[in-house]
């Protein structure tokens, strides 16, 4: 807990002064004021994060956090649990959607075993940070102890910090893999937001009506059994969360402590980000939500964060796919701020509009 406390103490708000300087330059550039819309908002936020009018994006990396869930035994997913490890195999071979999109945007992909139920082959190039072989079943008790939840958060933070300080990565993205993980993610928002479970529950991997009703009942039972306190985000994570969700939240905290931008993917990654921002509200200054997931509860999560997603493409895959697509937009925003000339620099008449 001491390590987590030190991490939280290091998180400072982004600079309002540098954000104001960025807006001054953006409004002086050779185009009608605000004509690049939200791209300019992203650019100003990057300046605030980096405390610079030349915020470098540079090397990009996506961490796909993988973990299994005891609640999968309740039949809440259309896929069996062994698919988690099988998909990790696809990631490391470069076969999956995240691999294709990451190559397109020029980002590295690194898979992290936070708690896959099986032992992965030793020759697979994954970061091995296993907290256990899947969480306990949240429908009958807590997913993990508070101590393990803290370890998950610190692991996520350390992964980002190592990639930044030792390898020079400057823009981070998060993604997930874990059969059944929309169930704990839904439980997290229900616990933190106090909204009815049915209004937040989606179809995940494509479950039918019978499985959907079962999923709603399972989440309601998990909340009744664990009684998570919305004012205790660490307790919520331990009670109804997941190992990879903890690491996803920790990644946000780690990026914020380093003052580097991080993009979260969809439903599961945003659940981790929400926990992080409840633990350290200032961490939200460093966070971008990549896209609006088709999972029904995602809008509630984004609203709780007070953010607007960069993209809205009806995606619901996870893996980090939304982060990959959003990275190029974030990079484009930085380039507009840095490279576009002002009216004065270009010798163009400014009408002030």
UniProtKB/Swiss-Prot annotation:
CDD domains, per the entry: DMB-PRT_CobT
Family annotation (InterPro entries): Nict_dMeBzImd_PRibTrfase, Nict_dMeBzImd_PRibTrfase_bact, Nict_dMeBzImd_PRibTrfase_N, Nict_dMeBzImd_PRibTrfase_sf
Broad class of enzyme this protein falls into: transferase
GO MF term list: nicotinate-nucleotide-dimethylbenzimidazole phosphoribosyltransferase activity
SUPFAM superfamilies in UniProt: Nicotinate mononucleotide:5,6-dimethylbenzimidazole phosphoribosyltransferase (CobT) (SSF52733)
Glycosyltransferase is among the record's keywords: yes
Reaction(s) catalysed (UniProt annotation): 5,6-dimethylbenzimidazole + nicotinate beta-D-ribonucleotide = alpha-ribazole 5'-phosphate + nicotinate + H(+)
Keyword Glycosyltransferase carried by entry: yes
EC number(s) from the headed UniProt entry: 2.4.2.21
Annotated active site: 319
Keywords: Cobalamin biosynthesis, Glycosyltransferase, Transferase
Protein origin, superkingdom: Bacteria
Gene Ontology annotations of biological process type: cobalamin biosynthetic process
Biochemical pathway: Nucleoside biosynthesis; alpha-ribazole biosynthesis; alpha-ribazole from 5,6-dimethylbenzimidazole: step 1/2
Function: Catalyzes the synthesis of alpha-ribazole-5'-phosphate from nicotinate mononucleotide (NAMN) and 5,6-dimethylbenzimidazole (DMB).
Family the UniProt entry places it in: Belongs to the CobT family.
Cited HAMAP family: CobT (MF_00230)
NCBIfam families: cobT_DBIPRT, PRK00105.1
Name of this chain's protein: Nicotinate-nucleotide--dimethylbenzimidazole phosphoribosyltransferase
UniProt organism field: Syntrophobacter fumaroxidans (strain DSM 10017 / MPOB)
Classification lineage: Bacteria, Pseudomonadati, Thermodesulfobacteriota, Syntrophobacteria, Syntrophobacterales
């Amino acid at each position: 807990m001491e390590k987590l406390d030190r991490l939280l103490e290091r998180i400072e708000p982004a600079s309002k002064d540098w954000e104001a300087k960025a807006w001054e330059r953006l409004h002086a550039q050779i185009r009608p004021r605000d004509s690049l819309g939200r791209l300019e908002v992203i650019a100003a936020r990057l300046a605030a994060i980096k405390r610079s009018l030349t915020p470098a994006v540079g090397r990009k990396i996506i961490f796909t956090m993988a973990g299994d869930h005891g609640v999968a035994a309740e039949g809440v997913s259309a896929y069996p649990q062994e698919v988690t490890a099988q998909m990790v195999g696809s990631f490391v071979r470069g076969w999956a959607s995240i691999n294709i999109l990451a190559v397109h945007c020029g980002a590295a992909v690194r898979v992290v075993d936070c708690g896959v139920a099986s032992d992965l082959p030793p020759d697979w190039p994954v970061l091995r940070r296993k907290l256990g072989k899947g969480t306990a079943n949240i429908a009958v008790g807590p997913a993990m102890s508070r101590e393990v939840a803290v370890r998950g958060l610190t692991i996520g933070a350390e992964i980002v910090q190592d990639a930044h300080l030792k390898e020079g990565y400057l823009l981070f993205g998060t993604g997930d893999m874990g059969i059944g993980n929309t169930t704990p993610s839904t439980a997290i928002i229900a616990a933190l937001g106090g909204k009815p479970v049915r209004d937040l529950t989606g179809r995940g991997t494509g479950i039918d009506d019978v499985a959907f009703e079962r999923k709603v009942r399972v989440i309601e039972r998990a909340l009744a059994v664990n009684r998570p306190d919305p004012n205790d985000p660490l307790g919520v994570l331990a009670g109804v969360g997941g190992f990879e969700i903890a690491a996803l939240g920790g990644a946000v905290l780690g990026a914020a402590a380093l003052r580097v931008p991080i993009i979260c993917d969809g439903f599961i990654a945003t659940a981790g980000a929400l926990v992080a921002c409840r633990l350290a509200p200032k961490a939200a200054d460093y966070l971008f939500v990549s896209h609006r997931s088709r999972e029904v509860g995602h809008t509630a999560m984004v609203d709780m964060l007070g953010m607007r997603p960069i993209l809205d493409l009806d995606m619901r895959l996870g893996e980090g796919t939304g982060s990959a697509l959003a990275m190029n937009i974030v990079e484009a925003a930085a380039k507009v701020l840095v490279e576009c000339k002002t009216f004065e620099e270009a010798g163009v008449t400014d009408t002030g509009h």
